[in-house]
């Protein structure tokens, strides 16, 4: 069943030596990324731990579990994902949308648009640009916040989704996933294996059950992402 699947995927991808996240009292957790993180959040809200501010995506599903399980820590959880964004757009808003929060835990999911928009929008980026831009952003972040705990989430595309024309996506998109995992190792970040989780889950139910378009997860896909994130970070 799904809990065993999640454990198996994380164990297989991360091994025994993977870093875990440590939470302290009043810990600030920030989710960053694109539309998958955004989840239709209210961008006028600056509150933490609220439905409008957290959106309705995996960040909300993850936050509710964290707030319940770690109630004694009085966590402060924020979401600053913005739909459509690629790495260079993260960098453009990094001061106000990341560093000013002084997060103790910073979770980043970025990459699907860095590839998808080369197919759909004429974007001229490459996997090399993606990797180098993200590496530079992570270096800068660690310079400014040397004690931040990083969580790097694997970009994913659910095979069989309506927006995923497999011959145009694979194996090319795999290079972005490989680059992200490489960076997780370089920065001693927690790696969250979303692609592997969706690949495994698609053997239990078809792709359209998890993410109809293959990019934006539906309700069970959002919960799956939350479960994988919590398993990978050791915070379940």
Task: Show the residue positions of the predicted features.
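Serine-esterase "nucleophile elbow" of acetyl-processing enzymes
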Residues: 3-80, 95-102
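Alpha-helical cap/lid subdomain in secreted, periplasmic
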Residues: 23, 56-76, 85, 89-236
């Amino acid at each position: 069943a799904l809990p065993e699947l999640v454990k198996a995927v994380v164990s297989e991808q991360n091994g025994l030596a993977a870093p875990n996240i440590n939470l302290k009292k009043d810990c600030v957790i920030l989710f960053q990324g694109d539309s998958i993180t955004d989840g239709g959040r209210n961008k006028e809200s600056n509150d933490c731990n609220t439905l409008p501010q957290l959106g309705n995506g995996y960040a909300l599903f993850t936050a509710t579990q964290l707030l319940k399980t770690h109630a004694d820590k009085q966590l402060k959880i924020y979401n600053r994902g913005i739909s459509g964004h690629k790495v260079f757009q993260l960098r453009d808003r990094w001061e106000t949308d990341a560093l000013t929060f002084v997060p103790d835990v910073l979770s980043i999911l970025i990459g699907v648009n860095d590839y998808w928009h080369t197919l759909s929008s004429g974007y001229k980026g490459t996997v090399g640009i993606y990797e180098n831009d993200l590496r530079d952003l992570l270096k800068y972040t660690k310079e400014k916040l040397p004690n931040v705990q990083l969580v790097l989430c694997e970009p994913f595309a659910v095979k069989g989704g309506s927006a995923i024309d497999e011959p145009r996506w694979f194996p090319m998109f795999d290079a972005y996933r490989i680059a992200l995992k490489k960076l997780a190792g370089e920065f001693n970040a927690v790696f969250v294996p979303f692609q592997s989780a969706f690949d495994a889950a698609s053997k239990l139910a078809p792709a359209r059950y998890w993410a109809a378009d293959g990019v934006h997860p539906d309700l069970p896909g959002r919960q799956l992402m939350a479960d994988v994130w919590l398993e990978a970070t050791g915070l379940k």
